[in-house]
Amino acid sequence: MSSEPFKNVYLLPQTNQLLGLYTIIRDKKTKRPDFVFYSDRIIRLLVEEGLNHLPVTPNTVETDTNQSFDGVSFLGKICGVSIVRAGESMEQGLRDCCRSVRIGKILIQRDEETALPKLFYEKLPDDIADRFVFLLDPMLATGGSAIMATEVLIKRGVKPERIFFLNLICSKEGIENYHAKFPTIKIVTGALDKGLDANRYLIPGLGDFGDRYYCI
């Protein structure tokens, strides 16, 4: 179900297990091995939820007991596109769920002169326009990088309805900015934070995800 009051935002069920995982990764005292382990658990949950939104077609198979089972098969192929570098942390979670999945990368950094996001690099599957795309970035703060990455995908022929944006934490401002540009794209997230601080970090947040995950 879409998370009110945001249309096309799908929040993971706020179970005690999930809240416990977020408590660990938000804690500034958590060491890197634990931060990586528990972040990976959340990422896996996000990927599984993203897969729930892919279209399917009926498929009946025969079991080893010579009985019929009415199931489904996914329609179309998928790929992941990570926003480098933090988004690369989510690639393994996608690979764990989807064997031999194609992965693309987009590098966006802040222009020091304008303070605006700037595209530096992209490497995407040649047939990306024919695939469903999981856009991967752990944090949605202002939405600038995600908006630019999505513009790259659309310019490469990907239809907005085939894009699913997966992240661990969103801000209200980031959601509003992103959906002002792309209202039909589904966002799958695990947490909605209350806002941004003066440095444009999510609050309560967890700091710089990439630094904590890669220990740089």
From Swiss-Prot:
Its EC number is 2.4.2.9. InterPro entries: PRibTrfase_dom, PRTase-like. It is an enzyme of class 2 (transferase). One of its GO terms (molecular function) is GTP binding. GTP binds at R32, R41, L75, G76, K77, I78, R102, R131. Keywords: Allosteric enzyme, Glycosyltransferase, GTP-binding, Nucleotide-binding, Transferase. This is Uracil phosphoribosyltransferase. It comes from Lachancea kluyveri (Yeast). The gene is FUR1.
